[in-house]
């Protein structure tokens, strides 16, 4: 696999993480740089690990994963999206969600897992190609780290101007992404 192909693959696998991070940055209002880096680290680690897991599973688990991956992605993304919508509409004022629950590592991890299901499927497909899976996984992880950290900072700027609206849009986008994954797999 050429370096250009690896770069395109890494960017493609990172787009969902970027979009979610923009929404997260907007929802949190004024996330600190350390929080943006933490978000990037979690997304990067999960996005790097899932193609490795998929690759290792290869042919053995592909039929099992293929049968349920869309339900897992839908459940995680829709759950996090609904959580964001409820949080946006339950606030009485325009303050950001700075509560411990809003900054929960578990919410962040669930979101990262939801956006990385496709990377696991890519990992399964890479098992049939002559690629260095470690290089590919590290590229995906590094790109996800950069795009997620940057997305949090972009979301911070958007959130200061649009606050609740940005959180609603992000929640709807997550629910829509989960639904699109489900529909795509059910109609195939």
From Swiss-Prot:
Subcellular localization: Cell inner membrane
Record field: transmembrane: 3-23, 41-61, 70-90, 104-124, 126-146, 168-188
Pfam families registered for this protein in UniProt: Mntp
InterPro entries in the cross-refs: Mntp/YtaF (IPR003810), Put_MntP (IPR022929)
Family that this chain belongs to: Belongs to the MntP (TC 9.B.29) family.
Function of the protein: Probably functions as a manganese efflux pump.
Record protein name field: Putative manganese efflux pump MntP
Organism name: Xanthobacter autotrophicus (strain ATCC BAA-1158 / Py2)
Lineage, broadest ranks: Bacteria, Pseudomonadati, Pseudomonadota, Alphaproteobacteria, Hyphomicrobiales
Gene that this polypeptide is encoded by: mntP
């Amino acid at each position: 696999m050429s370096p250009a192909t690896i770069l395109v693959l890494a960017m493609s696998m990172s787009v969902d993480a970027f979009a979610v991070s923009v929404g997260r940055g907007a929802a949190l209002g004024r996330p600190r740089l350390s929080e943006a880096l933490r978000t990037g680290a979690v997304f990067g680690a999960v996005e790097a690990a899932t193609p490795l897991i998929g690759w290792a599973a290869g042919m053995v688990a592909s039929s099992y994963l293929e049968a349920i991956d869309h339900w897992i992605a839908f459940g995680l993304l829709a759950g996090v999206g609904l959580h964001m919508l409820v949080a946006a509409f339950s606030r009485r004022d325009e303050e950001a969600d700075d509560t411990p629950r809003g900054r929960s590592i578990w919410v962040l991890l669930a979101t990262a897992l939801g956006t990385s299901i496709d990377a696991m499927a890519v990992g399964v497909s890479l098992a049939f190609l002559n690629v260095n899976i470690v290089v590919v996984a590290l590229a995906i992880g590094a790109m996800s780290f950069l795009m997620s950290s940057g997305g949090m900072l972009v979301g911070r700027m958007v959130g200061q101007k649009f606050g609740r609206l940005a959180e609603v849009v992000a929640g709807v986008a997550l629910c829509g992404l989960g639904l699109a994954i489900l529909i795509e797999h059910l109609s195939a």
